[in-house]
Each structure stands twice: as C-alpha cells, then as structure tokens.
Amino acid sequence: VYVLDSVRGSVTCFSSTAYGASMMQAVRLYEQGMYAESEALWEELLRQNQFQELAYDGIAKALLARGEYARSLPYFEKANDTYWYSKAFNEYRVEAVRAALPTVFAIAAILLAVLVTVKKLLRKRGSQKEKRPGAVRLAFSTMAHPISGYDEIRYTKQYSSFLAGAILAAWFLFSMIEYQYTGFLFNGHKPDSINVLLIFAKTIGLFFLLIFVNNALSTFMDGESTLRQLWISCAYALMPYLLLKLACFGLSHALSLEEGVWITVLNGCAVIWLVWQVICAVQTMQQYTFGKTLASLLFTVVGLAIVLFIAFLFFSLLQQVWSFVRTVFDELMLWQ
C-alpha cells in the first residue's frame, strides 16, 4: 500500500508483517475448508496473539475433522462458536454415553439391590406407631399438595425458620452458580461480569420487599397471616422452582443447541409452578378467596413498582444533594 503525502512531498510504502502474511494464508486455507493444513499456522498465530478468535475456531475445526471431539470443545468455546460447538458436543456425547453405560447399569443394579434389602428389613421390623409429621416433612409436602400442605402447616403452626432461611440462601447461591457455570450453549452471560450485589437484590432483596408489601396490604384486606407465617410459607413455595431450575442447570451441560427447547419448557414449568405455589401459600395463610388472592398479588406487584419508583427518586435526590455539597466544598477550598 502506497500513501502519498502532499505536505511533505513523500511516498510511504506499507507492507504486511510476518503476522499479517501468516494470517492471510491461514484465512485462505480456512475458507477453502483445509482445516488440517491451516492448524499449524493458527497455532503460531495464537502464540503471538492469544485473543484471536478465528485462530481458536480454525484449530477446533481441525480437531473436529480428526475426530478429537473432546479436545475441540474448549477451542470452540474460546472462539464463541455455538453452532460448531453443538456439533462437536453431539459426537462427544455419543462416545461418552457408550463408554459410561456399563458403569451406569452396574450402579443402578447396586442401588436397586440396596433398596429391596432396606424394604425387607423395614417390613421385618413391623409397623410402628404413626408419627406426627414434623416441620420439615410438612414443608416438603407442599410441593405435591400445596393447598392441604399449607393448610396443615397453618393449623399445626409448625413453621421452620431455619429451613426457610436455608431455601433462600440456596436460591441466592444457586443464582450465582447458574450465572457463572451454566453450560456454554445456554449461558448468555460473561463469566467475568458477575455482580453479587445485583444478584442478591434480584433474589433475597426482591423476595423480602414483596413480602413486606403484601403484608402491608393484608392490613387493608383483612388478611390473617403474620409476617413470619407469610415469609416462611412463600420461602417453601420456592422449593419446586429451585428443583426445576437445578434440572435446567444440569441439562445445560448435557443437551445440544437443537435440544434447548427442553430447557425452555422446564423453565416455563418452573415459573408456572412457582406462581401456583405462591397463590396457594398466600390464599391459605391470609385466608382469602381465590379471587381476593389474585387481587392481593396484583396489588402487591403495583405496590412494588411504587416502592421502587420512590426509592429511585430518593437515591436520585440523594445523589443531587451529594453533588451540591461536594461542589460547595470544592468552591470553599478554592477560596482558601
């Protein structure tokens, strides 16, 4: 490339560097589908520039062409190539399943034998007196039978603050793990951009804000639940949601891009199940009718929006006051 400079009256000649020449040659081979021939060039380019995504993609396709599916996956991930990552993962999964089948069948047979043995031992011991279900057992019963489960909890007054707190802590911790370690094909977040405070606000903070708003509304809607009953029962409502989200997390490491619809379906089921659990919890604890429960939840969402708007105005005003005080302080310092 020749560049004319009329001011200086000169001609400057630009020629490609060794790196540029290697890049052009590697790209030419890559576009022709000659991945194996371009592999050495890509490796040399990566030694000079570790942030060259096309080099990772070229090496990954060379490994894929040789049938080295497991080795190609990290390269496709660094190249951010979800399409070919999914193709390589499909082939790798077939090999992994074939290799693991004997072990899986052996473990399943052992577990089945242990289960049968335990059942026989329990049968020999005979029937015992039926024990009154504890707080933990009642909490888990709400997943399958939410209405009767919450009603029994309210009647027996067996609330476990420890279990409810553990559920909320698990939700917060799992949200961080999900953000960071969801499978590459289904993770739209950057691992280095995690904000723990934001995740805390979206989980624990949002949960208690909704609880406080709903509890405040219950004063005007003749609700019978206490604040403790309300937050514990709503924490119990998170259990099936967390279980389905955990299943989605596991599937994100086991499914290809084309099979991602199952994760979408499970996520939808998790949200629907959560909404139904919350409706049952609020209706039972507050002793509302179904229609009144829906109205209460709708007003709760509206109240949450109002609280967030007021909080935004407050922090905006606080920022303006701080800016004014800082400006006055700087002006006073200049006068000295």
Please give the residue ranges for each predicted region.
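Conserved beta-propeller blade signature
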Residues: 1-3
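TPR alpha-solenoid repeat register
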Residues: 21, 55, 88-89
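Selected alpha-helical membrane-embedding segments in polytopic membrane proteins
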Residues: 129-228
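Hydrophobic alpha-helical transmembrane segments and adjacent short intramembrane/lumenal linkers
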Residues: 198-200, 210-317
